[in-house]
């Protein structure tokens, strides 16, 4: 995770790409992370949630309604529901109701289309990446750029996923120890 970047006082401020370059590409996509790295990010900060089959993927929250094309996908209309996440009720489609294979058929969209209108040009172009794909991608970007690029993952809604039988911590640790 490039811990060495934090051991010495850096010559310049470190740049952390929260959700990647989410002002320029749909958040939490490899394209968003690539743009952030190209623009000089030292760290990529992916938020992680779990699919029904226990695979960690990058999404800011468990509800897919605002960041994917799921609402336009009739084959998944019956999965719309209402769930309590982190003490609040949310209505939509939830990542833990989809297997990774199903999730990979969805495409990312801009979460704030009225604010970041330029990002809507990329709607439907990118898949939701897994944690392992992100690790591999950032490692390849580090090698290609000749500089260390770190990862600062955030496990989202841990209690919600634990109660669903999908404890994020165990999955995260098993990936890191593999």
Please tell me what each predicted stretch does.
Residues 1-178:
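Phosphate-group recognition and catalysis centered on beta-loop-alpha active-site segments
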């Amino acid at each position: 995770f490039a811990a060495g970047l934090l051991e010495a006082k850096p010559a310049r401020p470190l740049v952390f790409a929260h959700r990647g370059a989410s002002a320029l590409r749909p958040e939490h996509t490899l394209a968003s992370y690539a743009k952030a790295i190209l623009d000089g990010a030292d760290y990529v900060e992916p938020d992680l949630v779990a699919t029904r089959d226990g695979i960690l993927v990058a999404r800011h929250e468990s509800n897919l309604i605002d960041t994917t094309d799921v609402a336009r996908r009739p084959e998944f209309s019956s999965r719309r529901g209402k769930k309590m996440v982190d003490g609040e009720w949310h209505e939509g489609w939830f990542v833990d109701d989809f297997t990774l294979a199903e999730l990979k058929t969805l495409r990312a969209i801009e979460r704030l289309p009225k604010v970041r209108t330029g990002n809507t040009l990329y709607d439907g172009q990118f898949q939701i990446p897994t944690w392992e794909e992100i690790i591999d991608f950032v490692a390849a970007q580090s090698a290609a750029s000749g500089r260390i690029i770190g990862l600062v993952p955030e496990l989202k809604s841990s209690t919600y996923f634990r109660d669903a039988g999908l404890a994020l911590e165990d999955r995260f640790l098993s990936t890191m120890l593999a």
